[in-house]
């Protein structure tokens, strides 16, 4: 599901706070790192995410729960890394190996409607690319060069 941009004035007024609370509840209920509005059948360019190295076993800086509206990104250099990803939208799959840009520049609005521009690297950049893909109607499977690394959460047969 492709999403449409969110009105900056509506973000500034706090019109989406109840929706963000629902998104957070869903993300936590399913132990997600992030969740985008299209994943709950709402075609808006908004997502929540957090990077918690303690639970994700990554050598990364923490990023507190963050809401981004109308987010876009561009790569900072051609360097890419491959790593495993999974997704709440594809619950029957454990995940697969996905190449992502190592460093990206993000432009978005925060939950107060202020413009943001920042760089992210490593796992933080991977999470952002994954969530922004949802806003563009993509899932991680669309980014996989081959499906050989896919792992299922249940056995069939």
Task: Annotate each predicted stretch with a short phrase.
Residues 1-157:
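Positively charged
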């Amino acid at each position: 599901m492709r999403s449409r941009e969110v009105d900056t004035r509506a973000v500034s007024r706090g019109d989406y706070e109840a929706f963000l609370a629902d998104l957070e509840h869903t993300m936590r209920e399913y132990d997600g790192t992030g969740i985008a509005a299209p994943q709950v059948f709402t075609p808006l360019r908004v997502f929540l995410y957090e990077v918690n190295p303690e639970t994700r076993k990554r050598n990364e800086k923490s990023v507190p729960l963050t809401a981004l509206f109308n987010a876009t990104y561009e790569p900072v250099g051609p360097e890419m890394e491959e790593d495993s990803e999974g997704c709440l939208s594809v619950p029957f799959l454990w995940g697969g190996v996905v190449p992502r840009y190592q460093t990206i520049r993000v432009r978005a609005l925060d939950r107060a409607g202020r413009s943001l521009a920042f760089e992210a690297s490593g796992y933080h950049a991977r999470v952002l690319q994954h969530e922004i893909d949802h806003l563009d109607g993509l899932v991680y499977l669309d980014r996989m060069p081959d499906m050989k690394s896919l792992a299922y959460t249940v056995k069939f047969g």
